[in-house]
From Swiss-Prot:
Keywords: Carbohydrate metabolism, Hydrolase, Magnesium, Metal-binding. It is an enzyme of class 3 (hydrolase). PANTHER family: CARBOHYDRATE DEACETYLASE (PTHR31609:SF1), YDJC DEACETYLASE FAMILY MEMBER (PTHR31609). It comes from Thermoanaerobacter sp. (strain X514). Its cofactor is Mg(2+). This is Carbohydrate deacetylase. Its EC number is 3.5.1.-.
Length: 249
């Protein structure tokens, strides 16, 4: 069987992102999202779960955008003089203290579990989990909280070796220049047996998103493609089963 998890990263970043997640669930092929727990609209998770009962919610561990959930004094190697996460991943974490990384990751996990939705998995913003200072803590926390994880080409080998539950295939090229309907149809046409995740970032683009994210207008295009009737029909015609990470629990 071919199982497909289309996951929307960045839930909670803006209202427009959350609205895009709902749209792609109700009228498209999206069945999973991951929450940026340090962002202002993360709290909408429960409300949106009620609108989208089969939507899975994961944790989008964030170490290079916005402010930490921990007090800046506790994670001073992660933040700048204003108390925001240092920008410029991966080098922004090169001098980060591993114990401070652990503190912040666990704060974000605890926040996710407090939102009132079942947490299906864990992944990370800009694939921060793959950083040498992060990967061991990421694995440790996945074990501690019994969470399946996304595995990327940068960290798949170590995640598999650690014995964590993860997808069989991870597709990351439906992004930026790859945000084209024909590209998504090609990806769907070459799906392998097992469980595949396609990373996505759909949204309704508003001023708030334009001001805080350099990846903006393409999110609107992603949204229209993920709800396209030809894409929906392809899924039906090829017996692809839409899922979220709870399939791995």
């Amino acid at each position: 069987m071919k199982y497909l998890i289309v996951n929307a990263d960045d839930f909670g970043l803006t209202k427009g992102v959350n609205k895009g997640v709902v749209e792609c669930y109700k009228n498209g092929i999206l069945r999973s999202t991951s929450i940026m727990c340090n962002m202002p609209y993360a709290h909408e998770a429960l409300e949106i779960k009620e609108l989208c009962p089969d939507l899975g919610f994961g944790i989008h561990i964030t170490l290079d955008a916005g402010k930490p959930l921990s007090s800046p004094e506790k994670v001073n190697t992660l933040v700048d003089e204003r108390g925001y996460f240092k920008r410029g991943f991966p080098h922004s974490l090169d001098d980060a203290d591993v114990d401070q990384i652990r503190i912040e990751i666990e704060e974000q996990i605890k926040k996710a579990f407090s939102l009132g939705v079942t947490i299906t998995h864990m992944d990370s913003h800009h694939h921060a989990q793959s950083h040498p200072r992060v990967i061991d803590v990421f694995i440790e926390m996945a074990y501690k909280y019994n969470l399946p994880v996304r595995s990327t080409p940068l960290d798949r080998e170590i995640i598999i070796k650690a014995g964590l539950k993860t997808v069989d295939n991870f597709i990351y090229n439906f992004y930026d220049e790859g945000v084209k309907k024909e590209n998504l149809l090609s990806i769907l046409g070459s799906l392998k047996e097992g469980i595949t995740e396609i990373m996505s970032h759909p949204a309704y683009v508003d001023d708030e998103l334009m001001n805080i994210s350099s990846y903006n207008t393409k999110r609107e295009i992603e949204r229209t493609i993920l709800t396209d009737k030809d894409v929906l029909q392809f899924i039906l015609d090829n017996n692809i089963l839409l899922a979220n990470y709870s399939i791995l629990k």
